[in-house]
Amino acid sequence: MTIASSNGSNRAQSPLITDLAEAINTRPDRNTHNGREPELHQPSEEDMESMMGAVRSILVGVGEDPEREGLLKTPKRVAEAMRFLTSGYNQSLEELLNGAVFDEGHNEMVLVRDINFFSLCEHHMLPFMGRAHVAYIPNQKVVGLSKLARIVEMYSRRLQVQERLTRQIAEAVQTILEPQGVAVVMEASHMCMVMRGVQKPGSWTVTSAMLGVFQEEQKTREEFFNLIRHQPAFF
């Protein structure tokens, strides 16, 4: 069994999946068309100008003056922030992994817990943020520990709903490693529930995705849940 934080691994590279590019581009989830990731373009300067214009319109719409001193640079700042917060659209698993898949012969649970993340709700474009716990039971192959955190980050930096985000992370790990099973739990606070709507600060949403042995075997699920509840003594 391996338990880690979101720190990286220094193993020597030994890529195993030769057709990874094809494998990771074909996953059935709600962001795909016919099982394939949609074609997305890199944001251009024209796109930036369009976003800046949209922000100016919003400022006018709420009764503000976009020409006053404090707001002069706001459209550009918001556009740059949105580009960063949605940068996961312009990343791929193939580039993210960079060959960091290794044949270790390990067959006990690997868990990286307490991965901090932030994302944007696709309904209101307000933030939600929290912690992710990602585990898998290898079938010979393992991945650099930091890559699990980067997978969480890549899918989080898109317009999301927490349920889909949880499932996408689990399916990504399943695709790249073909392990015996994958488990993902995400705990998050949603600003669309805190700042508007029901206005309930302190509420948390918990979602899970279980694949393979984590779905099929209660004992394996219980081990995972016990590990993510346990507080490490050395912190």
Swiss-Prot record:
Gene3D superfamilies: 1.10.286.10, 3.30.1130.10. Its EC number is 3.5.4.16. InterPro entries: GTP-CH-I_C/QueF (IPR043133), GTP-CH-I_N (IPR043134), GTP_CycHdrlase_I (IPR001474), GTP_CycHdrlase_I_CS (IPR018234), GTP_CycHdrlase_I_dom (IPR020602). GO terms for molecular function: GTP binding; GTP cyclohydrolase I activity; zinc ion binding. Residues 27-44 have a biased composition (Basic and acidic residues). Residues 26-47 are annotated as: Disordered. GO terms for biological process: one-carbon metabolic process; tetrahydrobiopterin biosynthetic process; tetrahydrofolate biosynthetic process. Keywords: GTP-binding, Hydrolase, Nucleotide-binding, One-carbon metabolism. NCBIfam families: folE, PRK09347.1-2, PRK09347.1-3. Belongs to the GTP cyclohydrolase I family. This is GTP cyclohydrolase 1 1. It comes from Nostoc sp. (strain PCC 7120 / SAG 25.82 / UTEX 2576).
